[in-house]
Structures are given as C-alpha cells and as structure tokens.
Design a protein with these regions (language model features):
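Alpha/beta-hydrolase-fold serine-hydrolase catalytic core, especially in secreted/extracellular enzymes
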Residues: 241-243, 251-351
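The feature captures the conserved acid-bearing segment of alpha/beta-hydrolase catalytic domains
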Residues: 175-262
Length: 444
C-alpha cells in the first residue's frame, strides 16, 4: 500500500510523519476546540510499535483544566478506528465540562491480525506515548497544565486492560477508572501477559469492573464467555485488600458496550466530585468512605443483593463490592435489572439557531444523566419534524450521534442541521429547536 508523507505542526514546530494505512485515514475534523497529534510507530525496543493519534476536546471558557477524561477503545481495526470520534461524543463531553476537564480519545493503528498486547499493555510503550501526547496537546491547545492534571480513565476490552494497567503504573495520577470487559493480569489471572504488582497506592483509586452478563457472568459459553474469568482475579486481588472497587453486569449484552454509559457517567461524576483537587498541581483527594455504599457479593450477578451504606455493613470487605454514593447505588440496582436507569432532569436547550433560506443549523449540549436522543423542530408553533426521523441503535438506547459497538459516535458525525424542504418561499417562518434526552424529557 502506498504511504505518503504528511506534514504535521505542533506548537509551530513542523515534523514529518507518515500517513496511516487507508483504514485509519482520519476525516473527523480537529479544529479548535479539538486538537490532534499523531506519532509514527517506533523501531526502538520498549517503545510503541504502532502509529497512534490522540484527539483532544477542551470545553469552552475553561481557563485552567482540572483533569482529563480518557475514552480508550479496544482491540482490532474496528474498535481502534472507533477512537477517531471519541472526543466528539456529546455525552462524555457533558461529564468533562461539568468538572472542567478535557476529553481525550486515542486511536492506536493496530492492524487487524496484529498483537493487541503491544499497545493495550501500557508497559509496551503506550504509557510513554500517552504522556508525550499530554505534553504536546497541552502546548498546542494553550493548556500546558494538561501534562500534570489527573486522569479519569474509561476503557473497553483491550482498553480496559490499558486503563487498569495505568491504575497500577500511575495510581497517583488516576482519579478513577472504569474497566469495561477487560482488566490487566495480576497474580492468579489466566492471561498469559506478565502480571502486575498490586501497589498499595492503587487501592486508593476508585475502579469499576463492568461486563455484559454474556461474558461469563451468568452465561458461560460463547465467544466472550471467558471474559469474567480474566476480570474476576483482578477484582478479588483489589477488593481483598480493601480497594475501592466494584463490579456491574449489563443483563442485555455480551462484549458490546450497550447502555453502560448511563451508569459509567454518573459513577465517574461521583468519583470526580470526591477526588479532583480544586487547585491544579495538588494531590488527588482521598475518598473518606462516609458516603460509600456496598453490595454483598453473594447474588450480585443477578442483582439479587441490595446495596447498603458502607457505614452499617457488618460483613467482610472482601465479600462485597464498593460504590461511591447512594445515588450511584440506586442506579447500579436499576442497571443490573434492565439498564433503564431513570432520569428526571431536562436536557439543556439548544443554542445558536441560525436560519439561512430553508437551512437550519444550531448547537446543543447533551444532558449529563441521559445524553441526547434527538431534537424536535417546530415551525410557526407546530411540530415540523423529529430528528433523527428513524432512530436506530443496535447497541443500546437510540442517541442523536448514533452509537458504535465501542461506545463512540459513528462516522460520519451527524450534523445539527436540517433543510426545510416545505418552507414557503418568501415567507418568514419562526423556528424553534427542542432537545430530547434518552429518558424522553424535553428542554424548555
């Protein structure tokens, strides 16, 4: 395959890199507030053997970032390519915006049949590449504090291995970590990769191990029936030492991410509220435990065990799972039942509606709790159309940006744009755009 040189510029310094194979050609825009850096593969021992790009989103009006939320894809070309849109996800942006954090999505350019461990084990060079990207993106975005702020890590499959590995390598930097369908190898794990030492500092990091029930939780056979067998030793190694770790299972899914974001984002929200320091450069705050809830492990797989305040729990810590708050405990119970976590909050109203001829464009933010399902457009006081007109999502609740297997918007990105083909020429119509979240609630 022909490869062409590409000139990239970071902080005014031109460097020569090589373009990606066709499957990784990235057409997703990276203009402010988005920023991107890409590194070519290295031939040096111990460094990353695959090319990688990192896309960063910075919320408007933030003078100094408090942290960075990292959305890490899994293994294989399809999952790796999904990382190209991760920083554009409006729902994850809502979480980052609330806590004055950036949102970062890597794309490791792993060939389909190549060894995923060569990037998803951060000891194989991806940790160093990540740290370099934070420095370079901090410079190009005008936020040099990016290289020292805490991280909130989300990872799917191989990304779960990566995020868990970063908890073990850099516990002082990780505010919280959500591991979907994957975890790194520790003593007792069946994985063949080199095991990690569980450092005491890692036990202070809130972690959630999340799976689909058909990944060996209640359904033991099938392609992904062995996933829980790899995750369970990690969970037990942590919880037996008193770690702040929980586990949850989607009753509707296997390896696809499904509706996990409706628990992951509230969980991450609670953890960031407990952990992020107000002053950049200060250490992460330790979780006091006064607001924590626990769930007895016996029967957790089907949601039969009820959460209870940790302060009144009389059982062994190692025989329970940890949750950061009563609100998250309530959401956990509903998620374990059917993933239909309720929401009573209205989404933010759209802004910046422009009408040029019969073309409407606007901007909108997602609801923190339930994301953005779509829009209702009114013309002259009456409903004109509901967008999307035919909502589809085979992996979970229908959302405006659509949803990939790996929890990112599909390509091409869906624009906030509508052409009113029935507009009367020469007449000035009055339009209104209303946001609708995935709980069905409308903006005012």
């Amino acid at each position: 395959m022909t490869r062409f040189p590409l000139i990239a510029c970071i902080a005014g310094l031109p460097t020569v890199v090589w373009s990606a194979p066709d499957v990784y050609q990235n057409t997703v825009p990276a203009e402010p507030p988005y920023y991107r850096v890409r590194y070519e593969k290295s031939e040096k021992t111990g460094e990353l053997v695959y090319p990688v790009s990192y896309t960063l989103w910075v919320p408007e009006g933030v003078r100094e970032l408090r942290g960075v939320v990292v959305h890490q894809h899994g293994c294989g070309e399809g999952s790796c390519k999904s990382g190209q849109t991760g920083a554009h996800d409006l729902h994850w942006q809502a979480l980052a915006r609330k806590h004055r954090c950036a949102l970062l999505s890597p794309t490791y350019e792993q060939p389909e049949k190549a060894d995923c461990q060569l990037w998803c084990d951060p000891r194989n060079g991806s940790s160093s590449a990540f740290l370099k990207a934070l420095t370079d993106l901090g410079r190009s975005s005008g936020h040099p504090e990016l290289e020292r702020v805490p991280w909130a890590l989300w990872g799917h499959s191989g990304g779960g291995h990566w995020a868990g590995g970063m908890v073990l390598l850099h516990p002082e930097r990780v505010a919280a970590a959500w591991l979907r369908s994957g975890a790194p190898a520790v003593a007792g794990s069946p994985q063949k990769s080199a095991v990690y030492e569980v450092r005491p500092e890692s036990l202070q990091v809130p972690v959630m191990c999340n799976l689909g029930t058909r990944e060996g939780v209640t359904v033991k056979d099938g392609r992904f029936g062995g996933v829980w067998g790899g995750v369970e030793p990690f969970f037990k190694a942590f919880r037996s030492r008193g770690a702040l770790i929980g586990v949850s299972a989607d009753p509707l899914t296997s390896h696809e991410c499904g509706n996990q974001r409706y628990l992951a984002i509230p969980w991450m929200d609670a953890c960031l509220s407990l952990r992020l320091p107000e002053t950049v450069g200060s250490p992460l705050r330790k979780v006091s435990g006064s607001e924590a809830w626990v769930v007895p492990l016996k029967g957790w797989e089907t949601g039969a065990s009820a959460p209870e305040p940790a302060a009144g729990y009389s059982g062994a810590v190692g025989e329970s799972l940890w949750l950061p708050s009563g609100g998250v405990a309530k959401a956990w119970s509903q998620y374990m039942k059917d993933t239909a976590i309720p929401d009573a909050t209205r989404p933010p109203a759209p802004k910046g509606l422009k009408v040029e001829g019969n073309v409407l464009t606007w901007n909108a933010e997602a609801d923190l709790e339930s994301g953005l399902a779509g829009f209702i457009i009114e013309r002259d006081g009456a409903v004109l159309v509901k967008l999307p007109e035919q909502p589809k999502n085979p992996f979970g609740r229908p959302i405006f940006q659509n949803l990939s297997y790996s929890d990112t918007p599909t390509q091409p990105l869906v624009p906030m744009r509508y052409v009113d083909a029935a507009a009367v020429p020469g007449k000035t119509h009055q339009y209104r755009v209303i946001s609708v979240n995935t709980a069905g609630l409308q903006s005012r």
